[in-house]
């Protein structure tokens, strides 16, 4: 029944390769559809917040995002409207999904109904390499997975650690990797001399930093 009104968007869907419904369909489904009736059309590419897009034709009405927003973040802005096969996920008309943990709903969505504007159409997941790391956005030290290809980072997602960040991370931390692309980012150590800075080698920089930190 999940596939009755579900569009065959796998070739263009960002969730392809890590979609639970796709895996179930491949493992248990038939090679072709037996559904002859016309599928119900629902809203697509809906901006429900500054960082997220919604495709209601892919939504399976699991309510994970609704419960996360209400129970974890205490930002009750998502819900279902209409009935039967016309039931759709939507956002509060006067309040977008804009809290700093909104992108976690993309992680817990089992299909491609919720997608991140930042990662949308950037790279297929099977081409990327995942590396375990720690978020450097703040002092909390959230455990993360860095998804990259050919020395370019495409996204950062939370890695479960119940002692630190559980299974979540803030949107600010997810976007923090863009600082690596900043044009003014330092690529070599520099030392201030008078009113200017001059380049120094790494051993000298490490020695100076060690001496400075040893005072504390």
How should these model regions be labeled?
Residues 15-18, 147, 180, 203:
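Low-complexity, intrinsically disordered regions enriched in charged/polar residues
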Residues 144-148, 158:
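Short beta-strand elements
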Residues 1-136, 140-144, 152:
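Fe-S ferredoxin-like electron-transfer domains
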Residues 34-40, 44, 154-215:
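Cofactor-/ligand-binding subdomain signature composed of acidic, glycine-rich
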